């Protein structure tokens, strides 16, 4: 394919136009008075959302250079979402501010490498100051506050807080669509482990890339399955029952994996293969946990059992299994309650007896998976469009809450970033490095400025007053009042704020040091017009 090139200022300005188009679409959503964005969907109803990363992912621009700029900011949103699960709009606003200010300086003759060093230096100091100002999340109310702020809905914050209370801070919480109007919380026994499907062709929902199995059989073995013939007798019994099967094994490979995928694609049966969790002795113990939870028998040489001789009554069952690329969740296993209780008691005894912190931590994880269960937030709404929007908000709020439990909370509403302004301004630097520090200083005020503008106020006035306010005191855009943000429950997770700043700075620094851009030339439409027929011809 033929390529086209742009250099230096032409390249950067073209990419900046793309950055601005994406960021301008995303930043209207920030703050309590932020607006929604409507996304066109080809085969379904339009999606209405205020989720930054969802909007960013939808944007494709016609001009290849502008599209590259947009993709860079998309990367900021994606990375922040991966690490912290929220804060994507803040990250986008920060990235745009740094790129715009940095480009002004590069155009004026500043050295981009010096600017990058200054940006890195400033971000490092800002992150350290954020951690110093961070407070631990210690009670149910604080967890609810974080969720409520992220979702802009107190009810959602309360549901997440209750879910975390019931299954623990590290427990498994899933979000499902409800058939009714109301949102409900349900806790079901279940187990999750960090192993996903062995082939993407096993998914049942290609949009979400998830395999969902209803009332599946579950084969638990510590063996490697290489030959399809080894499991064929068992699969024939499963096919007759017309139910799906989850295969948890040391490894499913070669002929066995190929035939499972082929039969899945032909619709002969639904089977999902996942690797057994853990390693060594811990793997055996975790397989036993899964077997007890589901009522299965572990097919292992230790018990003299062979896959060829396995029958359907050796399989476990569960009401539902969900398998993603990275995780498997078994919900409501049909194991014997007395056996589960005995296993829980055994694990508790082992936790008390062990002297190793590492072993204790792993045993506690197993106990939580066996006894803690899975909390399910069932999202209700009056229409499908509202349901999707509400579900996205709850997902963000859950991620935000987990991040808060992990690294603590800071003052919300962009206040935390302005609170570290003083520390960053004290950095001693010269020349282009100092200019790089100043780029970050200006960007630190961008989220507050945008929140104020979305509330119909003059952002510069709010920023100047905030710089002179007591630490922790900020502007509540929902009520147009100046309050102590932490006391008012307007908080952001430290991890979210930190990640947004770090990823925005990373992409901005790369953008500023760009000197040439190579893009593909769009293919022209070569369709020829229809030729006129001769008289009497079609």
UniProtKB/Swiss-Prot annotation:
HAMAP family in the record: CH60
A GO BP annotation: protein refolding
EC number: 5.6.1.7
Pfam families linked: Cpn60_TCP1
Descriptive protein name: Chaperonin GroEL
Sequence positions that bind ATP: 29-32, 86-90, 413, 476-478, 492
Keyword Cytoplasm: yes
Subunit details: Forms a cylinder of 14 subunits composed of two heptameric rings stacked back-to-back. Interacts with the co-chaperonin GroES.
Protein purpose: Together with its co-chaperonin GroES, plays an essential role in assisting protein folding. The GroEL-GroES system forms a nano-cage that allows encapsulation of the non-native substrate proteins and provides a physical environment optimized to promote and accelerate protein folding.
Organism (species): Staphylococcus aureus (strain JH9)
Primary residence: cytoplasm
One function term, GO molecular function aspect: ATP binding
Highest taxon listed in the record's lineage: Bacteria
GO cellular component term, pick one: cytoplasm
Cellular compartments annotated: Cytoplasm
């Amino acid at each position: 394919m033929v390529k086209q090139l742009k250099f230096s200022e032409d390249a950067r300005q073209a990419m900046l136009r793309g950055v601005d188009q994406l960021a301008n679409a995303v930043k209207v959503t920030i703050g309590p008075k932020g607006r929604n964005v409507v996304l066109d969907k080809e085969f379904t109803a339009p999606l209405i959302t205020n989720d930054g990363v969802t909007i960013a992912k939808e944007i494709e621009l016609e001009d290849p250079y502008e599209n590259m700029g947009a993709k860079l900011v998309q990367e900021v949103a994606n990375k922040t979402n991966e690490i912290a699960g929220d804060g994507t709009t803040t990250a986008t606003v920060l990235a745009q501010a740094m790129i715009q200010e940095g480009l002004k300086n590069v155009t004026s003759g500043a050295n981009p490498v010096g600017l990058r060093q200054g940006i890195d230096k400033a971000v490092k100091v800002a992150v350290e100051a954020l951690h110093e100002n961070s407070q631990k999340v210690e009670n149910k109310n604080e967890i609810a506050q974080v969720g409520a702020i992220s979702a802009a809905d107190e009810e959602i914050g309360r549901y997440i807080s209750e879910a975390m209370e019931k299954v623990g801070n590290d427990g498994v919480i899933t979000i499902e669509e409800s058939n009714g109007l109301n949102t409900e919380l349900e806790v079901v026994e279940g187990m999750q482990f960090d192993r996903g499907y062995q082939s993407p062709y096993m998914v049942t929902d290609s949009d979400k890339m998830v395999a969902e199995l209803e009332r599946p059989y579950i084969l638990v073995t510590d063996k490697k399955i290489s030959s399809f013939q080894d499991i064929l007798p068992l699969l024939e019994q499963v096919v007759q029952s017309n139910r799906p099967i989850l295969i948890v094994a040391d490894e499913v490979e070669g002929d066995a994996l190929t035939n499972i995928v082929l039969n899945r694609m032909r619709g002969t049966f639904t089977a999902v293969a996942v690797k057994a969790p853990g390693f060594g002795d811990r793997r055996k113990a975790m397989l036993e946990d899964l077997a007890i939870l589901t009522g299965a028998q572990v097919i292992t040489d230790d018990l003299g059992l062979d896959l060829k001789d396995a029958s359907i009554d050796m399989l476990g069952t569960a009401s539902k299994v969900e398998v993603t690329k990275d995780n498997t969740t078994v919900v409501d296993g049909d194991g014997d309650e007395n056996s589960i209780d005995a296993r829980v008691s055994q694990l508790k005894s082992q936790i008390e007896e062990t002297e190793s912190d590492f072993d204790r931590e792993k045993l506690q994880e197993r106990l939580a998976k066996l006894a803690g269960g899975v909390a399910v937030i069932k999202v209700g709404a009056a229409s499908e469009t509202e349901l999707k929007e509400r579900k996205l908000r709850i997902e963000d709020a859950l991620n935000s809450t987990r991040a808060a439990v992990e690294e603590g909370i800071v003052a919300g509403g962009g206040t935390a970033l302005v609170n570290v302004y003083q520390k960053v301004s004290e950095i001693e630097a010269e020349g282009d490095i100092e200019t790089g520090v100043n780029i970050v200083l200006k960007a630190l005020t961008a989220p507050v400025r945008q929140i104020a503008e979305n509330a119909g106020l003059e952002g510069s006035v709010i920023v100047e007053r905030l710089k002179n306010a007591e630490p922790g005191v900020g502007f509540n855009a929902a009520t147009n009042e100046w309050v102590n943000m932490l006391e008012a429950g307007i908080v952001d997770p430290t991890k979210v704020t930190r990640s947004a700043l770090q990823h925005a700075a990373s992409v901005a620094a790369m953008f500023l040091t760009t000197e040439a851009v190579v893009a593909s030339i769009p293919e022209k439409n070569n369709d020829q017009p229809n030729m006129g027929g001769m008289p009497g011809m079609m």
